[in-house]
Amino acid sequence: MQKRLAKIILGVFTLVGGVSGCAAAYEVFDSPSQPLPTLSNPPNSTVSQRSTTNEFAALEQSVHQQINKYRQSRNLPPLALDARISEQSRLHSQAMASGKVPFSHNGFEARVKAIGQSIPYGSAAENVAYNQGYSNPDQQAVEGWIKSPGHRKNMEGQFDVTGIGITKNAKGEYYFTQVFIKRR
């Protein structure tokens, strides 16, 4: 029952994210002139403090490989993984997992501007997901994105670099953020 509920929740949020959040992710932003502050975990956060452990690094690497495998199946070039983009993605996943921000694309423009401090970009997009109760949460997230037209559009976009951040909260919910960047 818990796995079925998790699948329903992922499906609902994937659909909602595809309808309400991803369209805005295709805006082209100018690189900022001033540095922006980055998000951090609030004190006493319910986010697992193991966000830099091997578990999350392995999940992030797996999502990257799955996305590139999907892109290859569509005759698209692979995306390079960038640690600076992954850091911004990870901070957003941590903020969602802790409840600091709702499950959403809130703050996307600020994340992209922060990335733009070190990576000049022409366009950017973002996918988010969350799930619980699966032995393969990374695969569930990617499959959900593939089934969602808005998320799939981001995966198939003319981007060349990406970052992925995954964390899990005390309830066992995994939160995923993937930012796509087209460098100038």
Give the ranges of each region predicted by the language model.
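Short active-site loop/helix that positions an aromatic residue
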Residues: R152-E156
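Short, surface-exposed glycine/acidic/tryptophan-bearing loops
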Residues: E87-S135
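N-terminal targeting leaders of exported, membrane, and organelle-targeted proteins
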Residues: M1-P102, N136-Q139, G157-R184
